């Protein structure tokens, strides 16, 4: 029975890693839509998001089967709980990346209000966070999980800078308001992706250490 449980745990862990990997694949495509006006790539982002949704449903069913069949305890139970609780976070990451791509496609229909320097930095940082998060989960690496949390603070700071800049643009010329508000929404979507990554990172830490401190 122990061997069967370990095999099932490896399978759902790999599934969660693959689900995170799918979101990670979405980020550069959404970046192309937003930063390089590649509205033609919006369909690819949506297609990847559908993969994320399907992965979520499959993993949720598998986690529930493991609980019913094996009744795991201690670290094994914490792993199943980590994955179950993180599925909605990862699914929401995908949704927010789709929102970024959709807004990017709409923004591409008119001249840019400004260069999207900080949005580009946010996207780059989120890609690093995702890579770091997957490694922390695969290797049970608390340090990488904590680094993911720290990187989210940088994403939050970039979002705050974007807000300040865009408020200035709106005050200077009311004609900028519509586009500035959409850019704020893009920034907010990216900030939320980081928040959901942080949630998963905190659960990885608890899984490994058994402590919430």
Swiss-Prot record:
- Domain of life the protein comes from: Bacteria
Q: Which GO terms describe its cellular component?
A: cytoplasm
Q: Entry's Pfam families?
A: PhoU (PF01895)
Sorted alphabetically, the keyword list is:
Cytoplasm, Phosphate transport, Transport
InterPro entries named among the record's database cross-references: P_transport_PhoU (IPR028366), PhoU-like_sf (IPR038078), PhoU_dom (IPR026022)
- Can you name one GO molecular function term for this protein? protein homodimerization activity
Which Gene3D superfamilies does the record associate with it? Phosphate transport system protein phou homolog 2, domain 2
Q: What PANTHER family does the database record attribute to this sequence?
A: PHOSPHATE-SPECIFIC TRANSPORT SYSTEM ACCESSORY PROTEIN PHOU
Assembly and partners are described as: Homodimer.
Entry-linked NCBIfam families: phoU_full (TIGR02135)
> What's the protein called, per UniProt?
Phosphate-specific transport system accessory protein PhoU homolog
Q: Which organism is it from?
A: Deinococcus radiodurans (strain ATCC 13939 / DSM 20539 / JCM 16871 / CCUG 27074 / LMG 4051 / NBRC 15346 / NCIMB 9279 / VKM B-1422 / R1)
